[in-house]
């Protein structure tokens, strides 16, 4: 006996006459649309679902025994019982002449009404300006779970009533599942209220989370930690923008001549230019997850962590070189403006707010043109030099971290290279990258000169970097610290070896705990080797 899946009440079937739509002829133009390319799915794998349903079509039962909905436009004669289907209630029965009718109590399947949505909202059946301009539309974005419920029915309804498909591309997205991969449902109680997420993290953070790392048609798991990371990115954009606009208030920013642009300026302009080209290609292919990741990485890493930091020196020393400061501010404003346009489809609220303050004389960001690739913003050599600067900076920071040198301790940096063009370009960067390289002086040479014998070296493409060890480390203090670390590690290794030698532990403890202890022993052993090497190097 069938029962209701929620309350357990016995379900008693009642046979009743239903209204159907004959589907054979309606399905043909919908099938032809996909096969001729007039309609396409992204990703293409959903073509199969569409065609399988239409090529195995069954007549559509459109009557529902519920009160809410559009009532079936069928009227029964109170005298003879015959029915009339009409837009309005008939004045008299064509069979017996009776003037009294009762409308069918059934309502239309909700998908029957929804199938008319693309054109009914535009004034159809009247031939309105909106219908002529907006129909057919370009892209429909929807989930794979309603392809046959809604998408197919909109397509054949569009052909039947207008002679055209309602759209030419169907972009399919997946479902948002909980952190365990389960579909959200009331019965599981695992639903997420988007309004609560928006109140806590903001609408832009939620939007960014839902699209980052996702491919069309694939499900995603929802984690609050991801929304928090998106909120942090929004804060990063906001703070960088505030820094730029705060400094613009103190200066009249004018577009500089090309020859004034520094290598870092040319590099970031080249980067945002390449980003524009790549993102445009991604968006055209509906690779939204790839596109948003690229603009996220560009803003966070290349713009904020590198260019803004390099530009600070020039801005803070405007009295010494006002031309350079103006140039840096113009580049900051220009690149930020373009980055905001690229980010806008994904985070519309924060980008609109910032853009309105950044360039108040321009129209709304929503109404502005999408950025275009510019040939005159391609600077391959500047990009190459900047990659050298980044490699050198990372090498220095990694070496200092290995040697536990605090960031507030500055040292000389020697950069040795046989590439004269590279040295010339690095000369321009010297002052502005000192803070990034944690240096009090940067010395450039063609050959190793005036470098202490005990200086540590870092090999990067095109150059070798030397850091004087005496500037970095108090030898006695470091030896003492390393000795204590050696004692601690020996103690940990002895403890782990003792536990693993205990048969009761290895045979009775959970396997994951035993493995965790083995992992600790391996980790401590490697750390001890590194500490001993450091002690030897300080003798």
PLM features: what roles do these ranges have?
Residues 1-79, 150, 182, 188-189, ...:
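Residue patterns forming the tRNA-binding/recognition surfaces of aminoacyl-tRNA synthetases
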Residues 1-23, 227-252, 345-357, 424-464:
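Structured, non-catalytic alpha/beta "coupling" segments that mediate domain-domain communication
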Residues 54, 234, 272, 276, ...:
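Short amphipathic alpha-helical coiled-coil/interface segments
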Residues 232-245, 265-274, 293-315, 359, ...:
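Core structural elements
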Residues 66-69, 73-79, 83-218:
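Alpha-helical recognition segments enriched in aromatics with Gly/Pro capping
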Residues 357-539:
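C-terminal low-complexity, glycine/proline- and small-hydrophobic-enriched intrinsically disordered tails
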Residues 101, 178, 211, 251-280, ...:
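Acidic, turn-prone loop/beta-hairpin segments
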Residues 35-48, 129-143, 190-192, 215-227, ...:
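Glycine- and acidic
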